[in-house]
Regions:
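N-terminal beta-strand motif that seeds the catalytic metal site of vicinal oxygen chelate
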Residues: 2-30, 79-82, 132-134
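A generic local structural motif
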Residues: 4-8, 55, 68-71, 103-104
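Structural motif
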Residues: 8-11, 34, 74, 118
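Core segments of cupin and vicinal oxygen chelate
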Residues: 11-14, 20-64
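Vicinal oxygen chelate
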Residues: 15-24, 54-61, 65, 71-99, ...
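A common structural junction motif
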Residues: 37-40, 100-104
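Short loop/turn motifs at secondary-structure junctions and domain boundaries
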Residues: 107-110
Length: 134
């Protein structure tokens, strides 16, 4: 056993960094959170092969946690998600996979951090995101 056994390794996750809401219209949600709630934009990035996706994060000034405003996944509204942060996405991926957790393969696009998606037993989405500050 020992540390070479990934099932015995401690978690590398250090923070719940992002809560994710599914919104019908990212621009309308952005206007609400910035104009009415006083949040600031933390990220607004196009990604994907043809820039077809938009990652949009807002937060209250000074907050370390962010709120992502996501379009519906798989064209269906609903479904909760959180983003958790780790300094080593690949180590956490290996650890969870060794424990029998179904995880998607890590992915990275220019301008976005390396990450992978997984679900808890109830189907809630969890994005495991590599951060240099985690």
């Amino acid at each position: 056993m020992g540390m070479s056994d990934p099932t015995q390794a401690p978690t590398t996750v250090t923070n719940i960094g992002v809560a994710m809401f599914t919104v019908a219209d990212q621009n309308a949600a952005l206007a609400f959170y910035t104009e009415k709630m006083g949040f600031e934009v933390r990220a607004d990035v196009a990604f994907g092969e043809n820039g077809e996706y938009r990652w949009l994060e807002v937060a209250p000034p000074g907050s370390t946690a962010r709120l992502a405003l996501n379009p519906p996944m798989n064209d269906e509204p609903g479904g909760s998600a959180i983003g958790i942060e780790t300094a080593d996405v690949h180590a956490e991926h290996a650890r969870l996979k060794a424990l029998g957790v179904e995880v998607e393969e890590p992915m990275s696009s220019p301008g976005t951090p390396t990450m992978f998606m997984m679900r808890d037993p109830d189907g809630n989405h969890i994005a495991v995101v590599e951060t240099s500050g985690a």
